[in-house]
Amino acid sequence: GQPLMMKWPKKVKKAMNMYDWAKEKDDLVEVIYACMDGYVYFLDLETGEATRDPLYLGFTFKGAGALDPRGYPIMYVGAGYDSNEGTARVFVVNLLDCSVMYTFGNNDEFSLRGNLSYFDSSALVDAATDTLIYPGENGILYLIKLNTSYDPEAGTLSVNPDHIVKWRYYGTRTRVGSY
């Protein structure tokens, strides 16, 4: 997958679980890399030094994640394979504290591909409607109203997803028997 890069504003960095030196570095560009070993790594682009502890999610990530286009400290990343942790799914991660705010897509009964639920694509977020758009290899396009609440002054961030629309699409790889 592709790494993500972000130069966080000082106010945002102050609320993050970054190492103190990273919070203080004015020109820090943080590289965020979800890897095949189940970890998400956080690095200084200039030096390669870790900016915070890695986040273990326990799934293989082989596609590109996405950062929220509004500058909110949110990462959207989907697992590319099942693991000992369960069936592959999408993670919505709070980058202030590296907590998982929401997951979806695993074992979706709406899928044409049974329990297969890989998510190698990168997410889109419609900033105007606060809607996450995420295609899955399970043959479902997810449109999820996030109801994001972000207060940079207080350093708080949450999502309360509702109004989930699932659009089923058909193709060579969307049915169990045809792949």
Predicted regions and their residues:
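Noncatalytic, solvent-exposed loop/strand surfaces
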Residues: 1-179
